[in-house]
Structure formats: C-alpha cells, structure tokens
Amino acid sequence: MNIIGIDPSLNSTGWAILSVHDNNYNEIRLVDNGSILTSNKKTIGERLNKIYSELLNILNSYKVDTASMEEIFINKNPKSSTLLCYARGVLLLTLNVACIPLFEYSANRVKKSITGNGHAKKEQVCFMIENILNIKCHGTYDISDAIAVAICHIYSIKAF
C-alpha cells in the first residue's frame, strides 16, 4: 500500500510517499518525497494549477492508495490563512479527481504519534523520523511534515 503525506502550502507543498507491504505496518519504507514549489511572481491561479498538475502526476506515477494531511490551522494573519486555504482546496480537488481517500489529523496528534509528545518541536519530529525510517532527515520542514503525517496515518491504521 502506498500512502502520500501532504503538507499544504501555496509556496512549497511538501509530499512524501511511504509504502507498507503485506499489511506489515512495522516495516515502513520511504519511496520518494519532494516539494511542489511555486513562484510568487505568478498569479494565484497559475500557482494553484501547478500544484494541481504536479500532484496529479505524482499520484498517478506512484499508484497512491490513500492520502493524509494535517487538519487546517488558521493563524493570526488572515492573508496567510486564505492562501493556505486556496492550496488545501486544490489539494482536496486533486485527490478527489484521482479517487484517493483523504485522512486528516490534527498537528498535535501527528506529533504525539511520532514523538509521544503532542507539542514536540519540528527538530524532535525529524529526529524520530530518522529513527523510524532509518533515513537522514534533511531538506525542508515541508517534507518532514509530510512524512510525519503519513507515518501518523500508518500508525492509525495499525491500531485497528
């Protein structure tokens, strides 16, 4: 089973494909990861279209079965929150077009499932990702956040 974790952003949407074979949820493998980058010199419509087309290509390339994403978080800056909502909307549409079910988790639940602490810092989450997947957690936090939400989903499935 291939699971995609997504960290939404209009600037840099992080994604990670994790694989679990034969329902062995103790053996999680990182298949691939990356970021969908958009330029703030483009129109919002062009940026959203890039997110849509790149995510659709990723979903088709890796035969993704399910998706996971953090629940929406509204911050104090209304403009930032609005732009995040635009990106999330396109991500939801893309998953729907590809017929991929989405599972959403709160940020605290993701952190708690990875580190045991719902208020863990991003560095602690990265440290645990390195231990769980036996990889080096480098790059940007949008990718590690995507990996974390995918692991959270796998752990949620395993619990049932």
Curated annotation (Swiss-Prot):
Q: How is the cofactor bound?
A: Binds 2 Mg(2+) ion per subunit.
Instruction: Recite the UniProt keywords alphabetically.
Output: Cytoplasm, DNA damage, DNA recombination, DNA repair, DNA-binding, Endonuclease, Hydrolase, Magnesium, Metal-binding, Nuclease
Q: Record-annotated residues binding Mg(2+) 1? A: 7, 142
Q: What organism is the protein native to?
A: Ehrlichia ruminantium (strain Welgevonden)
Q: What is this protein called?
A: Crossover junction endodeoxyribonuclease RuvC
Enzyme active site: 7, 70, 142
Q: GO MF annotations for this entry?
A: crossover junction DNA endonuclease activity; DNA binding; magnesium ion binding
The EC number(s) attached to this protein equal 3.1.21.10
Q: So what does this one do? A: The RuvA-RuvB-RuvC complex processes Holliday junction (HJ) DNA during genetic recombination and DNA repair. Endonuclease that resolves HJ intermediates. Cleaves cruciform DNA by making single-stranded nicks across the HJ at symmetrical positions within the homologous arms, yielding a 5'-phosphate and a 3'-hydroxyl group; requires a central core of homology in the junction. The consensus cleavage sequence is 5'-(A/T)TT(C/G)-3'. Cleavage occurs on the 3'-side of the TT dinucleotide at the point of strand exchange.
Q: Where in the cell is it found?
A: Cytoplasm
Q: Which Pfam families match?
A: RuvC
Quaternary structure (record): Homodimer which binds Holliday junction (HJ) DNA. The HJ becomes 2-fold symmetrical on binding to RuvC with unstacked arms; it has a different conformation from HJ DNA in complex with RuvA. In the full resolvosome a probable DNA-RuvA(4)-RuvB(12)-RuvC(2) complex forms which resolves the HJ.
